[in-house]
């Protein structure tokens, strides 16, 4: 009887946990696939934003939001 309980525990609990872990990975993969379609300029903007850096602005409308070394 104990052996059957162990087998049921393995299949009902551990197998379920293993499959739930795989399902959690899928949204990240879809997000990564969407990011591969970006142009190099869009990709650079995302990276600079994540690093907290700013791009150079056009000299015509340079303001406080621009990077200091640009204007």
From Swiss-Prot:
Keywords: Cleavage on pair of basic residues, Disulfide bond, Neurotoxin, Secreted, Signal, Toxin. It comes from Conus ventricosus. GO terms for cellular component: extracellular region. Pfam families: Conotoxin. This is Conotoxin VnMLKM-02. The lineage of its organism: Eukaryota, Metazoa, Spiralia, Lophotrochozoa, Mollusca. Residues 25-53 form a propeptide. InterPro entries: Conotoxin. Expressed by the venom duct.
